[in-house]
Amino acid sequence: MKSDFKFSNLLGTVYRQGNITFSDDGKQLLSPVGNRVSVFDLINNKSFTFEYEHRKNIAAIDLNKQGTLLISIDEDGRAILVNFKARNVLHHFNFKEKCSAVKFSPDGRLFALASGRFLQIWKTPDVNKDRQFAPFVRHRVHAGHFQDITSLTWSQDSRFILTTSKDLSAKIWSVDSEEKNLAATTFNGHRDYVMGAFFSHDQEKIYTVSKDGAVFVWEFTKRPSDDDDNESEDDDKQEEVDISKYSWRITKKHFFYANQAKVKCVTFHPATRLLAVGFTSGEFRLYDLPDFTLIQQLSMGQNPVNTVSVNQTGEWLAFGSSKLGQLLVYEWQSESYILKQQGHFDSTNSLAYSPDGSRVVTASEDGKIKVWDITSGFCLATFEEHTSSVTAVQFAKRGQVMFSSSLDGTVRAWDLIRYRNFRTFTGTERIQFNCLAVDPSGEVVCAGSLDNFDIHVWSVQTGQLLDALSGHEGPVSCLSFSQENSVLASASWDKTIRIWSIFGRSQQVEPIEVYSDVLALSMRPDGKEVAVSTLKGQISIFNIEDAKQVGNIDCRKDIISGRFNQDRFTAKNSERSKFFTTIHYSFDGMAIVAGGNNNSICLYDVPNEVLLKRFIVSRNMALNGTLEFLNSKKMTEAGSLDLIDDAGENSDLEDRIDNSLPGSQRGGDLSTRKMRPEVRVTSVQFSPTANAFAAASTEGLLIYSTNDTILFDPFDLDVDVTPHSTVEALREKQFLNALVMAFRLNEEYLINKVYEAIPIKEIPLVASNIPAIYLPRILKFIGDFAIESQHIEFNLIWIKALLSASGGYINEHKYLFSTAMRSIQRFIVRVAKEVVNTTTDNKYTYRFLVSTDGSMEDGAADDDEVLLKDDADEDNEENEENDVVMESDDEEGWIGFNGKDNKLPLSNENDSSDEEENEKELP
């Protein structure tokens, strides 16, 4: 069993807070998801999440124009600089103050950030002559605003910066001190916070947008004075312009009139003159400036639009809403959605892998069920029929049907081909179901209740209630069917485990006593053992046949449990969450993964009863329970100061409003407290492919995998990738480097030279170390090159080595390799056909050679029989259908891969049989 699992992706959350941004090519969208950053590839339909984590939720992110450096800053002002291509953290830095915005300059030399009421300009880390990576170097600090800065914008020539602030003003700043006279301007006149300020495409105008819906157009014009009439025409023709006589003045004023809705976010695309505005009502509008013509007006819902971004060409607009976790990419010219995703509003309760491991289903407290694609990371479908919290989900064996249980008293069956609810199961009375199990045949579904402690059994075909299994004296916590003999195992809070024979005649069940309440249960895939997690923090393993305990794992010391804000004692002395609430067997039965209401996921080796690896769920200090020690400065006799609700001190009215119902605090907590989400893991499950497992947590759906799917080009940032250096690497027998550099340069003659120069004995080693990003191009090259090449064996060795080393990755990413694999298939078909034709054309020559040898007369008779049989089969070859159709190929004698080949052997009958088997195995 592999134990080298690493974090690979985060599903279930697409946007949390902060700004979103496009890459320079417009193909990728970067979105902050809590304390991580997710990247959505809008062209290739896939996504990934960076492995690094912040200590708090991310407040601002930006990507430089070259697409190589990503900077992200959290709520406390701690920044992380990341190599975007390699996904490696390069530098940590603390700005020691909250940052509301960060932007790279268009030329990439500098980046500016809004730190409180100060504008800081820093030099972008770069590679100097000595090739040493330099840390952050501050270039300039500008002070002038009286309140916090809300946004900043660079000019296209990277000389000036526009900032907006809560002091109802905007300012223009120069990067260099020589031009400070040109930029010493303050834009006043707005009556509310200025949300954005932008340069026009020719930089002759400046647009400022305020929160109350006012748009001012500023132009750099000459000041009116009494001396203007006395100026001569010669003075007007002077080349030198006296800048002191010019100033920025308001030439036009426009208003949105959004029915009391405030402007929440705004962006402007200078090339297309497109202004995109998001409002607190969930509405967003598109305007054409400077005419202020309304182009489109749409809505995302009733929640505020928190951020908006536009790509480089101005065709796509991205909107984010943090209330429901919505992310939207809209193409305004065609009025169509490029991406429309939404995460779970509430915490996730359960997850289930599809039998092929390509999809995963999550169930949430909000009553919704979402189907996620593992490869792309996108949500495929959402089911909203449940009216209460969904407690469990599970697939049928074939993966086309899914079942779910809910606290609304129903168990529903879902068709994942038509995406509809085709069956609803209910009990004789209204009860709540909290666990679910499906028979391997898919004919019976069982659910355990919280109210009457019974296990209800339904027929999937008829939808009728078949039986109610009683015997438990407490709520049924977990159910599981055996995959071999359809035995049902149930666990309960009454400290017992019961093994039920659903299809047997006898329903007498002897309970297996456990020393504590059973919280979770998992049955080994072979159905011989069952593992349970108890309230005492132990995982006990029982043999099903003789009901004896065969193993016990003490997990209390392996669990990482932090201190909560409302705790009066330390985490070390706390009994909170010192147990696992969900466990799952690996498919070989050698390992168990476990999680609970704590900050750890543990992987155990079952035979040796030891901990293999422990994973930290989240390092986000904004979650309750991630810290082992609390800040003593905030601890008082009444509790932690973090519990005090300071929402009434917010500047925005919508943030100060108390949304609690009148009288809802009666009999409860009479003081206003601020509650933070708790870190927890509600469900874990291994993937059927055995190379990954998923965990449903507070942060979302965490995917841990053993596959290194990072597509990093190691030569992308190297300036020495030249044809000369490629030939030099080949001469020094650095075959892998030479091959990758040749594909990096994309010179056909160079690729051919390097490819043919690699020795046959080195091919397996080179093929096993090729970066995954180059696999489609190399396979496509071999498929096209081999058709015209005479090196048949050489090309086949390359194909075998590549498929052996990367077959799993190719199978998981079929959409990337479809073209390349068709080219290779065409080459293999032609080779096989040529071999068969050569054998057929030479069979009479072989017969003549055999007949001249007197010592082989007996064998010749046998050969004649083979030839006669072969000739008889030739008449039937025309009626056989081939799986692969070759273009412009009319030669006879080829019978396809599915045909039976009875051709004459070249040496003896044994070799012939071997060749027949090999030809049948050809794909």
Swiss-Prot record:
Residues 653-674, 869-923 are annotated as: Disordered. Keywords: Nucleus, Phosphoprotein, Repeat, Ribonucleoprotein, Ribosome biogenesis, rRNA processing, WD repeat. The keyword rRNA processing applies. One of its GO terms (molecular function) is mRNA binding. The keyword Membrane does not apply. Required for bud-site selection and cell separation. Also involved in nucleolar processing of pre-18S ribosomal RNA. Interacts with snoRNA U3. Interacts with MPP10. Component of the ribosomal small subunit (SSU) processome composed of at least 40 protein subunits and snoRNA U3. This is Periodic tryptophan protein 2. It comes from Saccharomyces cerevisiae (strain ATCC 204508 / S288c) (Baker's yeast).
